[in-house]
């Protein structure tokens, strides 16, 4: 079992900023990357709203810069996923897919993940290359010259739809209501774009597939149409598309802490107002895992800084900072 003063779980802007501050405070943090190193920004295109990059910067490039920066100050990064966290007594015990660790302080920066529609097939097809995705930036290119659909009505859905018009011949924007939740500027851009066809008051009931044979002779299921249900009159229709992008929100990655830390009804961690402290002394949370309101790269980074300073002060109070 290896012991560390500070362990940070997660490597988005929050985790990396927490690592930056704790490493500069000589606390030699250990960071676990988890299943999605770099977090949600690794599946976005250009980030144009992060201060200091007047031309914008690609999400993955921004995370690479942050990674290099924390390594420079002596952070240790391990590509391991935490499977179990015992926060009942200090030092806290963490079990990863590769070993056992203990820590005086834990900073939780596990972020949030894209939600699926709960019809089963969407998530399965996303893993098997069946034409379903939660990331337009990653997969948009594969749908050049095809007709596709985006499900959702918020900023993310509209942003994905607009981005996909670069590749697709037509983008059907499927929303369960008759108006979008996205910001006014986004809505105007989308509704002006002749490639975007809104499908109001519709939900996806099923993903219909056809079997294709790959050049290697393998059989794969690929999307051929969506079965839609009208939310007003209950009628059904079929929409032929070759791709589906799901953009219906996010789920905080907090199952690891169930029964140990308080969460709100949607699973976001609760922290003391104006700080990163959880009810367990020595355990701090930052980034999207505790923020369902702002969810921006810059606010995640800011809260990572808060968590690092809170952790540093707490360790000093306990006489554990030296």
Residues covered by each model-derived region:
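Glycine/small-residue-rich loop that forms an oxyanion/phosphate-binding "nest" at active or ligand-binding sites
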Residues: 77-141
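FAD-site-proximal beta/loop scaffold in flavoenzymes
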Residues: 113, 123-142, 246-294, 303-306, ...
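Cofactor-binding loop segments of dinucleotide-utilizing enzymes, especially the Rossmann-like FAD-
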Residues: 11, 34, 137, 153, ...
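Residue-level detector of alpha-helix initiation sites
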Residues: 12-13, 36, 112-114, 155-156, ...
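Beta1-alpha1 glycine-rich phosphate/pyrophosphate-binding loop at the start
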Residues: 4-73, 158-184, 264
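A Rossmann-like FAD-binding core segment of flavoenzymes
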Residues: 70-96, 101-103, 165-273, 313-322
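Phosphate-coordination loops involved in phosphoryl transfer and adenosine-cofactor binding
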Residues: 3-5, 79-80, 144-146, 201, ...
């Amino acid at each position: 079992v290896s012991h560390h003063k500070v362990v940070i779980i997660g490597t988005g802007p929050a985790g990396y900023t927490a690592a930056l501050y704790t490493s500069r405070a000589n606390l030699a943090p250990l960071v676990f990357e988890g299943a999605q190193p770099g977090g949600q920004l690794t599946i976005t295109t250009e980030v144009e709203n992060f201060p200091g990059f007047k031309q914008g910067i690609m999400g993955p490039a921004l995370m690479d810069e942050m990674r290099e920066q924390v390594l420079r100050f002596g952070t240790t990064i391990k590509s391991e996923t935490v499977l179990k966290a015992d926060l009942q007594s200090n030092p806290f015990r963490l079990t990863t897919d590769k070993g056992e660790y203990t820590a005086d302080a834990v900073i939780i920066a596990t972020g949030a993940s894209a939600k699926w529609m709960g019809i089963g097939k969407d998530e399965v097809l996303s893993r098997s290359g069946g034409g379903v995705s939660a990331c337009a930036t990653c997969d948009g290119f594969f749908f050049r010259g095809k007709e596709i659909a985006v499900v959702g009505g918020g900023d993310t859905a509209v942003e994905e739809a607009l981005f996909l018009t670069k590749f697709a011949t037509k983008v059907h924007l499927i929303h369960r209501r008759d108006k979008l939740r996205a910001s006014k500027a986004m809505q105007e851009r989308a509704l002006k774009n002749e490639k975007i066809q809104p499908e109001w008051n519709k939900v996806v009931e099923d993903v219909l597939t056809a079997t294709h044979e790959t050049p290697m002779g393998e059989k794969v299921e690929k999307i051929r149409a969506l079965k839609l249900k009208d939310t007003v009159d209950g009628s059904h229709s079929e929409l032929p598309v070759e791709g589906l992008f799901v953009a219906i929100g996010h789920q905080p990655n907090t199952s690891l802490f169930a029964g140990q830390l308080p969460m709100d009804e949607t699973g976001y961690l609760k922290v003391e107002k104006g700080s990163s402290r959880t009810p367990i002394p020595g355990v701090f949370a930052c980034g999207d895992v505790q923020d369902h309101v702002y969810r921006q790269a810059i606010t995640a980074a800011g809260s990572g800084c808060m968590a690092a300073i809170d952790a540093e002060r707490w360790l000093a109070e306990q006489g554990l900072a030296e």
